[in-house]
Amino acid sequence: MSTYFISDIHGCYEEFRILLEKSSFNDKKDYLWIAGDLVSRGPDSLKVVKYLYSLKDRVQIVLGNHDINLIAVHAGIKDNKKENYFDEFLSSPDSVELINWLRCQSFLKVDEKRKIIMSHAGISPQWDINIAKVCALEIEDRLSHKNYALFLKEIYHNNIDFWRLNLNQLDRLRYSMNSFTRMRYCYPDGRLNMFCKKSPDFVKYPLRPWFLMPSSISKVYSIFFGHWSSLKGTHVPKPFFPLDAGCCWGEELVMLRWEDGKWFSQAYLSKKCI
Protein backbone atom coordinates (compact mmCIF):
# COMPACT_ATOMS: atom_id res chain seq x y z
CA MET A 1 0.00 0.00 0.00
CA SER A 2 1.43 3.35 -1.10
CA THR A 3 0.29 6.98 -0.98
CA TYR A 4 0.79 9.22 -4.02
CA PHE A 5 0.60 13.02 -4.11
CA ILE A 6 -0.30 15.03 -7.21
CA SER A 7 -1.88 18.39 -8.04
CA ASP A 8 -3.15 20.61 -10.84
CA ILE A 9 -4.22 17.92 -13.27
CA HIS A 10 -6.29 20.59 -15.03
CA GLY A 11 -8.19 18.23 -17.27
CA CYS A 12 -5.03 16.61 -18.68
CA TYR A 13 -6.53 13.14 -18.43
CA GLU A 14 -4.21 11.26 -20.79
CA GLU A 15 -1.09 12.54 -19.07
CA PHE A 16 -2.63 11.71 -15.70
CA ARG A 17 -3.44 8.10 -16.59
CA ILE A 18 0.00 7.54 -18.12
CA LEU A 19 1.58 8.89 -14.93
CA LEU A 20 -0.47 6.48 -12.83
CA GLU A 21 0.76 3.61 -15.01
CA LYS A 22 4.38 4.73 -14.71
CA SER A 23 4.12 4.74 -10.94
CA SER A 24 2.35 1.36 -10.79
CA PHE A 25 -0.54 2.95 -8.91
CA ASN A 26 -2.96 0.23 -7.80
CA ASP A 27 -6.48 1.54 -7.34
CA LYS A 28 -7.35 -1.44 -5.13
CA LYS A 29 -4.49 -0.98 -2.65
CA ASP A 30 -2.96 2.48 -2.99
CA TYR A 31 -4.16 5.96 -2.06
CA LEU A 32 -4.12 9.11 -4.16
CA TRP A 33 -3.96 12.58 -2.58
CA ILE A 34 -4.75 15.43 -4.97
CA ALA A 35 -4.06 19.06 -4.07
CA GLY A 36 -6.80 20.60 -6.18
CA ASP A 37 -7.41 22.04 -9.64
CA LEU A 38 -8.68 18.83 -11.16
CA VAL A 39 -10.36 20.76 -13.95
CA SER A 40 -10.10 23.63 -16.46
CA ARG A 41 -7.47 24.65 -19.05
CA GLY A 42 -7.04 21.08 -20.27
CA PRO A 43 -9.64 19.39 -22.49
CA ASP A 44 -10.78 16.42 -20.40
CA SER A 45 -12.10 17.74 -17.09
CA LEU A 46 -15.09 15.40 -17.23
CA LYS A 47 -12.90 12.31 -17.65
CA VAL A 48 -10.64 13.36 -14.79
CA VAL A 49 -13.50 13.91 -12.35
CA LYS A 50 -15.37 10.75 -13.37
CA TYR A 51 -12.25 8.66 -12.87
CA LEU A 52 -11.55 10.15 -9.45
CA TYR A 53 -15.20 9.69 -8.49
CA SER A 54 -14.82 5.99 -9.33
CA LEU A 55 -11.91 5.62 -6.90
CA LYS A 56 -14.20 6.32 -3.93
CA ASP A 57 -12.29 6.17 -0.65
CA ARG A 58 -8.96 5.57 -2.43
CA VAL A 59 -8.72 9.27 -3.28
CA GLN A 60 -8.34 12.26 -0.97
CA ILE A 61 -9.04 15.63 -2.59
CA VAL A 62 -8.78 19.27 -1.61
CA LEU A 63 -10.45 21.81 -3.86
CA GLY A 64 -8.58 24.45 -5.84
CA ASN A 65 -9.69 27.76 -7.30
CA HIS A 66 -10.52 26.21 -10.68
CA ASP A 67 -12.67 23.54 -9.06
CA ILE A 68 -14.60 26.26 -7.22
CA ASN A 69 -14.97 28.11 -10.51
CA LEU A 70 -16.50 25.03 -12.16
CA ILE A 71 -19.02 24.73 -9.33
CA ALA A 72 -19.87 28.43 -9.67
CA VAL A 73 -20.26 28.17 -13.45
CA HIS A 74 -22.53 25.14 -13.04
CA ALA A 75 -24.65 27.14 -10.57
CA GLY A 76 -24.95 30.02 -13.04
CA ILE A 77 -22.98 32.40 -10.84
CA LYS A 78 -19.99 32.83 -13.16
CA ASP A 79 -19.67 32.83 -16.93
CA ASN A 80 -18.44 29.75 -18.77
CA LYS A 81 -15.37 31.06 -20.58
CA LYS A 82 -13.92 29.25 -23.58
CA GLU A 83 -10.56 28.65 -21.92
CA ASN A 84 -12.23 26.63 -19.16
CA TYR A 85 -13.12 23.75 -21.49
CA PHE A 86 -16.23 23.12 -19.37
CA ASP A 87 -18.78 22.52 -22.14
CA GLU A 88 -18.48 18.73 -22.12
CA PHE A 89 -18.72 18.61 -18.34
CA LEU A 90 -21.71 20.94 -18.12
CA SER A 91 -23.65 19.07 -20.81
CA SER A 92 -22.97 15.64 -19.31
CA PRO A 93 -25.95 13.79 -17.75
CA ASP A 94 -23.61 13.07 -14.82
CA SER A 95 -22.79 16.74 -14.18
CA VAL A 96 -25.16 17.27 -11.24
CA GLU A 97 -23.98 14.13 -9.45
CA LEU A 98 -20.32 15.02 -10.01
CA ILE A 99 -20.78 18.63 -8.94
CA ASN A 100 -22.51 17.51 -5.76
CA TRP A 101 -19.60 15.17 -5.09
CA LEU A 102 -17.08 17.96 -5.65
CA ARG A 103 -19.01 20.25 -3.30
CA CYS A 104 -18.48 17.73 -0.52
CA GLN A 105 -14.69 17.63 -0.87
CA SER A 106 -12.26 19.29 1.52
CA PHE A 107 -10.05 22.36 1.58
CA LEU A 108 -7.56 20.89 4.04
CA LYS A 109 -6.38 17.35 4.65
CA VAL A 110 -4.38 16.50 7.75
CA ASP A 111 -2.81 13.14 8.55
CA GLU A 112 -1.79 13.45 12.19
CA LYS A 113 -0.08 10.07 12.29
CA ARG A 114 2.32 10.92 9.46
CA LYS A 115 2.24 14.68 10.14
CA ILE A 116 1.14 15.52 6.61
CA ILE A 117 -0.93 18.50 5.47
CA MET A 118 -2.36 19.12 2.01
CA SER A 119 -4.15 22.18 0.67
CA HIS A 120 -4.31 23.75 -2.77
CA ALA A 121 -2.54 27.10 -2.39
CA GLY A 122 -1.04 26.57 1.05
CA ILE A 123 -1.64 27.49 4.68
CA SER A 124 -1.85 31.04 5.94
CA PRO A 125 1.23 31.86 8.04
CA GLN A 126 -1.13 33.75 10.36
CA TRP A 127 -2.84 30.50 11.40
CA ASP A 128 -1.91 27.70 13.74
CA ILE A 129 -3.08 24.19 12.89
CA ASN A 130 -6.21 24.37 15.02
CA ILE A 131 -7.41 27.60 13.39
CA ALA A 132 -6.65 26.16 9.94
CA LYS A 133 -8.76 23.08 10.66
CA VAL A 134 -11.69 25.14 11.94
CA CYS A 135 -11.56 27.55 8.99
CA ALA A 136 -11.50 24.67 6.51
CA LEU A 137 -14.52 23.07 8.13
CA GLU A 138 -16.43 26.35 8.00
CA ILE A 139 -16.12 26.76 4.24
CA GLU A 140 -16.61 23.03 3.64
CA ASP A 141 -19.89 23.25 5.54
CA ARG A 142 -21.09 26.18 3.43
CA LEU A 143 -20.10 24.65 0.10
CA SER A 144 -21.74 21.29 0.86
CA HIS A 145 -24.98 22.96 2.02
CA LYS A 146 -28.02 23.01 -0.28
CA ASN A 147 -27.81 26.82 -0.38
CA TYR A 148 -24.21 26.74 -1.62
CA ALA A 149 -24.98 29.06 -4.53
CA LEU A 150 -25.65 31.95 -2.15
CA PHE A 151 -22.32 31.25 -0.45
CA LEU A 152 -20.48 31.35 -3.78
CA LYS A 153 -22.14 34.63 -4.75
CA GLU A 154 -20.69 36.25 -1.63
CA ILE A 155 -17.32 34.56 -1.27
CA TYR A 156 -15.29 36.23 -4.02
CA HIS A 157 -13.52 39.24 -2.52
CA ASN A 158 -9.99 40.46 -3.20
CA ASN A 159 -9.58 42.81 -0.25
CA ILE A 160 -9.94 40.30 2.58
CA ASP A 161 -6.26 39.53 2.94
CA PHE A 162 -5.44 39.83 6.65
CA TRP A 163 -6.49 37.45 9.42
CA ARG A 164 -8.05 38.69 12.63
CA LEU A 165 -10.07 36.74 15.16
CA ASN A 166 -12.70 39.47 15.14
CA LEU A 167 -13.45 39.27 11.41
CA ASN A 168 -17.16 39.11 10.77
CA GLN A 169 -18.49 35.75 9.64
CA LEU A 170 -18.55 36.48 5.92
CA ASP A 171 -15.09 38.06 5.84
CA ARG A 172 -13.74 35.13 7.82
CA LEU A 173 -15.05 32.78 5.12
CA ARG A 174 -13.60 35.00 2.40
CA TYR A 175 -10.19 35.04 4.04
CA SER A 176 -10.22 31.26 4.39
CA MET A 177 -11.13 30.76 0.74
CA ASN A 178 -8.38 33.16 -0.35
CA SER A 179 -5.82 31.41 1.83
CA PHE A 180 -6.65 27.85 0.82
CA THR A 181 -7.14 28.45 -2.91
CA ARG A 182 -5.53 31.71 -4.10
CA MET A 183 -2.47 32.95 -2.19
CA ARG A 184 1.14 32.70 -3.32
CA TYR A 185 2.95 35.59 -1.67
CA CYS A 186 2.62 37.44 1.62
CA TYR A 187 3.67 40.84 2.87
CA PRO A 188 5.90 41.13 5.97
CA ASP A 189 2.88 41.69 8.22
CA GLY A 190 1.28 38.46 6.98
CA ARG A 191 -1.20 39.97 4.53
CA LEU A 192 -1.92 37.75 1.54
CA ASN A 193 -1.10 38.66 -2.03
CA MET A 194 -3.32 36.75 -4.45
CA PHE A 195 -2.27 38.37 -7.71
CA CYS A 196 1.47 37.92 -8.26
CA LYS A 197 2.13 34.63 -10.09
CA LYS A 198 5.81 35.08 -10.93
CA SER A 199 8.67 32.90 -9.80
CA PRO A 200 10.45 34.17 -6.67
CA ASP A 201 13.44 34.77 -8.98
CA PHE A 202 11.63 37.82 -10.33
CA VAL A 203 9.91 39.12 -7.20
CA LYS A 204 11.51 41.40 -4.66
CA TYR A 205 10.78 42.67 -1.16
CA PRO A 206 8.27 43.26 0.37
CA LEU A 207 6.67 40.15 -1.14
CA ARG A 208 7.77 36.76 0.19
CA PRO A 209 6.48 33.29 -0.71
CA TRP A 210 3.96 32.22 1.89
CA PHE A 211 6.08 29.18 2.77
CA LEU A 212 9.05 31.38 3.74
CA MET A 213 7.01 33.28 6.31
CA PRO A 214 7.37 32.34 10.00
CA SER A 215 4.83 29.64 10.85
CA SER A 216 4.23 27.23 13.70
CA ILE A 217 2.68 24.68 11.33
CA SER A 218 5.75 24.05 9.16
CA LYS A 219 7.78 23.16 12.25
CA VAL A 220 5.63 20.07 12.73
CA TYR A 221 4.11 19.02 9.40
CA SER A 222 5.14 18.19 5.84
CA ILE A 223 3.00 20.45 3.63
CA PHE A 224 1.86 19.51 0.12
CA PHE A 225 0.43 22.17 -2.17
CA GLY A 226 -0.14 23.05 -5.83
CA HIS A 227 -1.39 26.25 -7.52
CA TRP A 228 2.01 27.69 -8.39
CA SER A 229 3.39 26.37 -11.68
CA SER A 230 6.04 29.08 -12.04
CA LEU A 231 7.66 27.93 -8.80
CA LYS A 232 9.18 24.87 -10.52
CA GLY A 233 10.35 23.47 -7.21
CA THR A 234 12.93 26.20 -6.63
CA HIS A 235 13.30 28.24 -3.44
CA VAL A 236 11.20 25.66 -1.59
CA PRO A 237 12.74 24.32 1.62
CA LYS A 238 11.73 21.22 3.47
CA PRO A 239 9.13 20.40 4.72
CA PHE A 240 7.21 21.88 1.75
CA PHE A 241 6.34 19.86 -1.35
CA PRO A 242 5.16 21.86 -4.40
CA LEU A 243 3.21 19.66 -6.81
CA ASP A 244 2.21 21.95 -9.69
CA ALA A 245 4.66 21.51 -12.58
CA GLY A 246 2.57 23.28 -15.22
CA CYS A 247 1.26 20.42 -17.37
CA CYS A 248 -1.59 22.54 -18.72
CA TRP A 249 0.98 25.15 -19.80
CA GLY A 250 2.92 22.60 -21.84
CA GLU A 251 5.28 21.43 -19.08
CA GLU A 252 4.69 18.24 -17.12
CA LEU A 253 2.61 16.48 -14.51
CA VAL A 254 4.48 15.22 -11.46
CA MET A 255 3.64 12.85 -8.63
CA LEU A 256 5.40 11.83 -5.42
CA ARG A 257 5.22 8.45 -3.74
CA TRP A 258 5.43 9.17 -0.03
CA GLU A 259 6.88 5.91 1.24
CA ASP A 260 10.15 6.05 -0.70
CA GLY A 261 10.18 9.71 -1.77
CA LYS A 262 10.28 8.79 -5.48
CA TRP A 263 9.06 11.35 -8.01
CA PHE A 264 7.34 10.41 -11.28
CA SER A 265 6.71 12.74 -14.21
CA GLN A 266 4.88 12.83 -17.52
CA ALA A 267 5.35 15.55 -20.11
CA TYR A 268 2.31 17.07 -21.77
CA LEU A 269 1.36 15.19 -24.92
CA SER A 270 0.25 17.87 -27.34
CA LYS A 271 -0.49 21.57 -27.55
CA LYS A 272 -4.10 21.01 -26.63
CA CYS A 273 -3.98 22.86 -23.32
CA ILE A 274 -4.05 26.61 -22.85
Swiss-Prot record:
Keyword Transmembrane helix on entry: no
EC number: 3.6.1.41
Alphabetic keyword roster: Hydrolase
Keyword Acyltransferase part of the UniProt annotation: no
InterPro entries: ApaH, Calcineurin-like_PHP_ApaH, Metallo-depent_PP-like
SUPFAM superfamilies in the record: Metallo-dependent phosphatases
Top-level class of the enzyme under EC nomenclature: hydrolase
Cross-referenced Gene3D superfamilies: 3.60.21.10
NCBIfam families listed in its UniProt record: apaH, PRK00166.1
Role this protein plays: Hydrolyzes diadenosine 5',5'''-P1,P4-tetraphosphate to yield ADP.
Family listed: Belongs to the Ap4A hydrolase family.
Protein's name according to its UniProt entry: Bis(5'-nucleosyl)-tetraphosphatase, symmetrical
